[in-house]
Amino acid sequence: MSTLILTLPLARSGPATEYPYTLSPDGHNATRHARASAALLPAMGRAASEVVAVVPVRALSWQRVTLPPGISLQSPRLRAVLEGLLEERLLDDPAQLHFALQPGARPGTPAWVAICDRAWLRESLQALEAAGHPPARVVPELAPASDGPCELHALGTPEEAHLVITGHGPEQSVAVLPLSGAALTLAGPLVLGDEPPAILAEPAVATLAEKLLGRPVQLRTDSERALRAARSDWDLAQFDLASSGRTRALRKF
C-alpha cells in the first residue's frame, strides 16, 4: 500500500505552512522526499493509499499511568479517568491537552500516555483534511521503547540541535535535551559513559554530534525516521479525534 507520510509543523498551520513529506510504495522505502504546502502535496491514488501524520518529538510529553481495574478501553469515562490520574503531574489544564494511550494498554498494567496541545493537533489535522489529505493515522516521531536498547538521536540544525534519548532510565522513557556540552554533562554516563548506545544523527548535525560526543555517528535522515514512525503500532487519534482520520479516509472510498 502506498503511503504519504507528513510531519506536522510545530507552529500553528497556515496556508503557507510547508510539510516535510515522504512518499513510499511499501512503508519501507522512499520514492520521494521533499517539502510542500498542504495544497501542493502529492495527490494520492486509489483506495490502496494512506496518509500518515507524524507528531514531532518536541510536541509530545510522556507520562506513565496504571489504569484502574475494570475500566474498559472503550468506556466513555476513559478520558476522565486519565485526567484524574494525570492532573497533579501536568502544568497545563488537562482540558487543553490531547491524550493517547499506548497500543495494547490494559487495566492494572503500567502504560504510556502521549500528551500534546489539543488545539494545535486538531488544527493541524483539519488543515490537512481541508487540503484533501485526511490522515488515516497519527503517530509519534519517537516513542518510549517497550523493549530493545536505548537509542540516541541527534536532530535539527546546527543552530537548533537536540539530542533525543529513547529507552531512557528504568521506565524507558523519552528525553529531549539541547545538543550542547552542558546538557550532555547533565545527561551523565548514559551519553558519555564507556559503553554508550549508538548515535543516529541527521546529516545537518552529524558533525556537531561527533564533536560533542567524541565518537562517530550513524546517519539517519528525517525521511528514514518518518518511515520508521509510520510502521509503529501507535495511533494518537484517540478520544475526540478517534473518528477524524480513519473514518474520513474510509468515507472517501
Language-model features: where?
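Hydrophobic/aromatic-enriched cytosolic interaction surfaces used to assemble or bind macromolecules
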Residues: M1-F253
